[in-house]
């Protein structure tokens, strides 16, 4: 029996595939390669190039493979883009998940671990955020992810699907082997953007807003190493395979850093001055997001290994020095 990883050529998906295969699991990857990279897929994984909105392609996969569980990363995930092009997010995230769940139900696959987001909370009423805190998304991306959670809940009631939704905070870092790391085109995540400056690919870092109600006026986020995140997905899947009920877990380190603090850490790690300039706020950005992951630690037995931002940034820097253009040559 195999694990199907949808979006397994993307950043978090590819790291999860590596962790699964290192643990001796059989893995099937499906990705449309619109934002993922074929080179990021572990060579021992079976690969299908398909879009989850293509039900015929999904049906063919489920008929051909013996799938015992699904890990679902296939979604659009840029906050800013979701505000300017919300229909893309409803199409890819909601419609795509609807097609996937329909195919799973028809083929008797009833376990799914789902990549949700801290953006489901919106502007939190308290930090650290707990799983039962209010979910009032401030951007379309978070709204579609929350709707995906609700969709799984109703499909569970109707068809017996069992699911775990993992609400991530800021994934970062690279695989310890150096084989894979973070690569987006164009790049949208803070740490890779910062590291483009010492690579000579960017003159300065833009800090979007310095007037938030935080200690230095810049947004606070909770950063989590991508391999810790990958391990949490495997633990969540095993929780379902061992009879666990539907559940939602936060994943983070429980410690927040401002944008300016992340820039300072990157300066220390790289030895580069890394100029920064202030830009207007981005629509939909909450002032701070910090997770309580106590529930995942207690229920799943999750033990993050990388809780030091310097170590996380150093792993990302090692990847970018050896792969300055990501998975693309030139």
Regions found by a protein language model. Name each.
Residues 1-174:
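N-terminal Rossmann-like NAD(P)+-binding domain of SDR-like oxidoreductases, especially those catalyzing
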Residues 50, 54, 183-187, 255, ...:
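Residue-level signature of the cytosolic catalytic core of signaling kinases
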Residues 90, 138-146, 180, 184-192, ...:
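Short-chain dehydrogenase/reductase
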Residues 161, 177, 206-207:
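Oxidoreductase cofactor-interface core, primarily capturing Rossmann-like NAD(P)-dependent enzymes
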Residues 176-187, 196-197, 203:
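Hydrophobic, Gly/Ser/Ala-rich alpha-helical and linker tracts in large acyl-processing enzymes
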């Amino acid at each position: 029996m195999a694990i199907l990883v949808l979006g397994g050529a993307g950043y978090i998906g590819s790291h999860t595939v590596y962790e699964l295969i290192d643990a001796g699991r059989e893995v099937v990857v499906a990705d449309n390669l619109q934002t993922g990279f074929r080179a990021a897929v572990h060579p021992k994984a079976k690969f299908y190039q398909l879009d989850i909105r293509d039900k015929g392609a999904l049906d063919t996969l489920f008929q051909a493979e013996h799938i015992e569980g699904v890990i679902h990363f296939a979604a659009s995930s840029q906050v800013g883009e979701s505000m300017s092009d919300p229909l893309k997010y409803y199409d890819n995230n909601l419609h795509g998940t609807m097609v996937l769940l329909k195919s799973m139900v028809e083929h008797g696959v009833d376990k799914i671990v789902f990549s949700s987001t801290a953006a489901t909370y919106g502007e939190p009423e308290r930090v650290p955020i707990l799983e039962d805190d209010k979910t009032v998304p401030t951007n379309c991306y978070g709204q579609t992810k929350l709707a995906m959670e609700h969709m799984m809940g109703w499909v569970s009631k109707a068809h017996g699907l069992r699911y775990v939704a993992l609400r991530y905070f800021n994934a970062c870092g690279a695989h310890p082997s150096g084989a894979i790391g973070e690569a987006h085109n164009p790049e949208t995540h803070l740490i890779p953007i910062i590291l483009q400056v010492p690579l000579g690919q960017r003159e300065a870092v833009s800090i979007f807003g310095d007037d938030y109600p935080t200690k230095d006026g810049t947004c606070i986020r909770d950063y989590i190493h991508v391999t810790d995140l990958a391990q949490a997905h495997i633990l969540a899947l095993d929780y379902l395979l061992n009879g666990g009920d539907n559940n939602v877990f936060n994943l983070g380190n429980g410690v927040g850093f401002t944008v300016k603090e992340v820039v300072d850490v990157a300066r220390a790690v790289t030895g580069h001055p890394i100029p920064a300039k202030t830009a207007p706020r981005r629509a939909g950005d909450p002032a701070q997001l910090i997770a309580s992951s106590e529930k995942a630690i207690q229920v799943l037995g999750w033990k993050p290994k990388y809780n030091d931002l310097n170590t996380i940034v150093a792993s990302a820097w090692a990847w970018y020095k050896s792969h300055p253009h990501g998975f693309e040559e030139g």
